[in-house]
Amino acid sequence: MTHIEIVEMDGQLVEGIGSYCLRSKKKSEGYKGKNKWLNQQFEKDLRYVQLLEDHKQVGFIEYTDAEYSSRVVHADGYVMIHCLWVSAVGKGYGTQLLKKCMDDAKQRDKKGVAVLTNDHTSWTPSKALFLQHQFQLVATAPYDFELLVYPFSEDVELPYFPHNWHDRLTGYHNLTILRSFQCPYVQVATENILAAASKLGLSVDLVEIQSRDELMEKSPTPYGIFSVIYKGQLISFHRLTVQSVYKKLQTLLEGPV
């Protein structure tokens, strides 16, 4: 009989069981950066919950109080889900993880639960599961981002996005990467940008986001933890291949300054 276990991680368990993403490359900079970030965020009550099937990692959910979230959303009093991932669909694993999050939020008297989705990238959770559980779409933002929310009562204020996305891009003329290690794949994404830039003889300004306030002020997308900007235009908010980056940058180099 299959044994299912939900394990709420802490620093000691992350050191032992390991975090979920990039676990096959535990010596990589991305994996080590993620674990360091997790240990810092555990002190701010971040929850990192893994689902084990017969002691094997098959899914996880990461969420935190919105006031400490890595998503550019105004949602004070809510829980914000960063990630939800399962290795197999149709087994109810996603529902179990989501229920864990919602139960925890209710027990802590939160206003509700919110999540950022985007159908055009796998870097955010799929919205299908949340719609199945009566989350409602409350806001949209450029680049196909959507904000889904499950409020616990009808009289609470709903979360919302900032509205100055375009203004956030205008100050960057040089090729610039804004990042934090909430996602371990940020390192690989960064390396691909650097490789493409090197082929074109471009220097890169790398900005490490150090705080929630800095994230809320500077990020040009709701995703928050990875943005590539050149000549006032967003190149990407997720990992691209070196060739894809090269083509995008080359197009901008050949166009008007």
Give the predicted meaning of each segment.
Residues 91-106:
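Conserved acetyl-CoA-binding loop-helix of GNAT-fold acetyltransferases
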Residues 50, 56-67, 80, 85:
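Conserved beta-strand in the GNAT
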Residues 116-117, 134-148:
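Conserved catalytic-core motifs of GNAT/GCN5-like acyltransferases
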Residues 1-53, 164, 183-185, 189-192:
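Short amphipathic alpha-helix that is part of the acyltransferase structural core
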Residues 164-199:
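Local sequence-structure signature of Cys/Sec-based thiol-disulfide redox active-site neighborhoods
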Residues 231-257:
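Non-catalytic, surface beta->alpha helical segment in thiol-disulfide oxidoreductase systems
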Residues 105-119:
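Conserved GNAT acetyl-CoA-binding A-motif
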Residues 82-91, 119:
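A short, internal acetyl-CoA/4′-phosphopantetheine-binding micro-motif in the GNAT/acyltransferase core
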